Amino acid sequence: MSQSLFNLKSLSRSINNTIRMRRYIVITKASQRAYTIGSSQEKPSWASDPDTGYFRPETAAKELDPYIAKTSQVQGKMMRGEELWWMPDPQTGYYRPDNFARELDAVELRSLHFNKNQKTYVVS
């Protein structure tokens, strides 16, 4: 009885090993095939963009018209908030960004807060 169990175990191990080896062979061949296909494809050459200084594929650099690139660059800056309009400050006369928020010191903040919360009484 024990001999038949031993034979059954060895048979099952050999079947498992065969299946594992076949999986391993299939996987390695597939990965080798993908590697050779991937390495045979043409690699893009990279060119630096004169406006931004970033490297991009040469085909994309050739296709972009300089006007379109400049326009999209300005639009990107405006979306990020980097494009600023400068206007003269009415109090100081110096130029500052249009979206500049005037800084308030602690005394001004305190007075604004207390004036809002105080009740006014009408004396008649």
Curated annotation (Swiss-Prot):
- Give the CC-aspect GO terms: mitochondrion
Pfam families, alphabetized = LEA_3a
Q: Which domain of life is it from?
A: Eukaryota
Its primary localisation, in coarse terms, equals mitochondrion
Localisation: Mitochondrion
Q: Which UniProt keywords apply?
A: Mitochondrion, Transit peptide
Transit peptide segment: 1-35
Q: Record's InterPro entries?
A: LEA_3a
Q: Which family is this protein grouped under?
A: Belongs to the LEA type 3 family.
This one is known as Late embryogenesis abundant protein 37
- The record's gene field reads LEA37
